[in-house]
Amino acid sequence: IAACRFLQERLKLPCIQGYAFGFLEHGEPGVEYVKPLDFCSSQELKEDEQMACFEYIFSYLPLWYPREKAYGICETVEGSRRNFCYSKIDSSYLR
């Protein structure tokens, strides 16, 4: 996280997103989403970093999982971010 924050402003959020995607890409098969969601929820991240992180991971869920599994993953997300997760999945499947 600290390394990302030392980058130029325009690169900070993509760097955070890249870390999260690395967790997704190299996660345990079938539960690849657990570590990136934990990372995005980290209290070490600022609010804008968390939002960018979640948005990025949520947008990949429909590419990695069937719709039912993606919705089930959204169920594990806390509070208002759950609806954001659903909206990212719905918009992906409506294309």
Task: Show the residue positions of the predicted features.
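Non-catalytic tandem-repeat scaffold regions and their flanking low-complexity/translocation tails
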Residues: I1-R95
